[in-house]
């Protein structure tokens, strides 16, 4: 054995002697051990006590139907990060090691184990307005490009405030159209948007009630766009208003819905942040891919003064959707948007900045 391997072995032995291993499981699978002694169900956080030097368990990630295990997450003080095989944690054979014993006796020692699961493709229903539709329509391309084989979708559109969940429910023709899709009982993912003319939760509740009655395993998403007429508000104020609404309206609303629908996945896509970041870069002279804030010629962030998305905003926002819905690692995503600006890096930064409590809990 080389010195390098010996040092690594000693370090691993010490780390494995922690008093507690916290196993965090997404809602898309479970973690068990080969011995059957430990069973951590979907959505649970399980604390495993390691109290002696004879602990020997092999942890196995079990994906739920429609998901695949893509490896153990790489986290601070995490075990087996980056590996895709069962994770064996073993303290056996170190009797008499004083350093090891001291770690075992230290109640502050805690280490982590967390699997990553990825959907093989959701059967999805997307409904919303014109600030929402282009991103929904981009998903089949991006899902296929990312190697997600079973993505299917239906998109229902209504312009302006008519695309808000409550307005779509109150529109008999649209409601019947959407209910017909839900009635099949096989919608895995139901994505809705937001419009300030309907700030309350009534529409979301009505759709959740109906969808869950057809399929109790449906997951729900609130996709938050940017504000309209961006040119009428200074950039700093425009950004501040969006972030304030995101944190004080959308996230609290999701928390309320989670309390009313326990056990149901409800989360947020902050794709409106894409418009904010592009505008900030444009104002700073750091966005040479466009010439105007708003223009109908395809060389702007917005295609008109009302604020509809031009190509670069659609491409950036679609990357945010892709990571939010499917957990795709954008650093390795094999697609070149074709801009000088690194849109994949910006999209990853947007998702990194998003409050993780409101990300998809199944990743």
How would you describe each model-predicted region?
Residues 54-95:
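Surface-exposed interfaces of beta-sheet-rich extracellular modules
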Residues 179-311, 323, 332:
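Alpha-helical cap/lid subdomain in secreted, periplasmic
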Residues 124-127, 131-210:
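Conserved SGNH/GDSL esterase-like catalytic core that processes O-acyl groups on lipids
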Residues 292-363:
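Conserved catalytic region of serine esterases and O-acyltransferases that act on ester linkages
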Residues 119-145, 335-338, 347-363:
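N-terminal module-boundary/linker segments of secreted carbohydrate-active enzymes
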Residues 23, 31-33, 59, 69-72, ...:
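Extracellular/surface recognition and adhesion modules
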Residues 36-66, 107:
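Extracellular modular ligand-binding repeats in secreted and cell-surface proteins
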């Amino acid at each position: 054995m080389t010195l390098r391997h010996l040092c690594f072995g000693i370090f691993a032995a010490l780390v494995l002697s922690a008093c507690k291993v916290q196993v965090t499981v997404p809602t898309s699978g479970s973690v068990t051990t080969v011995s059957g002694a430990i069973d951590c169900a979907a959505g649970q956080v399980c604390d495993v006590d390691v109290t002696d030097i004879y602990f020997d368990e092999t942890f196995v990630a079990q994906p739920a139907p429609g998901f695949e295990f893509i490896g153990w997450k790489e986290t601070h003080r995490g075990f087996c990060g980056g590996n895709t095989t069962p994770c064996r944690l073993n303290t056996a054979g170190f009797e008499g090691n004083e350093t090891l014993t001291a770690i075992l006796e230290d109640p502050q020692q805690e280490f982590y184990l967390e699997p990553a699961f990825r959907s093989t493709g959701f059967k999805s229903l997307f409904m919303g307005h014109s600030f929402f539709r282009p991103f929904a329509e981009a998903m089949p391309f991006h899902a296929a490009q990312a190697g997600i084989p079973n993505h299917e979708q239906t998109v229902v559109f209504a312009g302006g405030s008519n695309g808000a969940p409550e307005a779509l429910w109150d529109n008999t023709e649209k409601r019947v159209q959407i209910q017909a899709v839900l009635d099949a009982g096989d919608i895995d993912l139901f994505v809705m948007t937001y419009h300030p003319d309907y700030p309350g939760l009534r529409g979301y509740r009505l759709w959740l009630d109906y969808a869950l009655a057809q399929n109790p395993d449906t997951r729900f998403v609130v996709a938050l766009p940017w504000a309209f007429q961006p040119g009428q508000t200074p950039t700093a104020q425009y950004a501040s208003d969006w972030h304030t609404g995101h944190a004080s309206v959308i996230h609290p609303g999701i928390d309320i819905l989670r309390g009313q629908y326990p056990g149901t996945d409800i989360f947020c896509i902050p794709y409106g942040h894409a418009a904010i970041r592009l505008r900030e870069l444009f104002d700073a002279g750091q966005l040479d891919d466009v010439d105007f804030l708003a223009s109908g010629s395809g060389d702007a962030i917005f295609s008109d003064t009302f604020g509809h998305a031009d190509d670069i905003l659609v491409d950036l926002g679609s990357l945010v959707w892709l990571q939010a819905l499917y957990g795709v690692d954008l650093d390795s995503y094999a697609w070149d948007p074709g801009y000088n600006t690194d849109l994949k890096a910006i999209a990853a930064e947007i998702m990194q900045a998003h409050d993780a409590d409101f990300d998809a809990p199944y990743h």
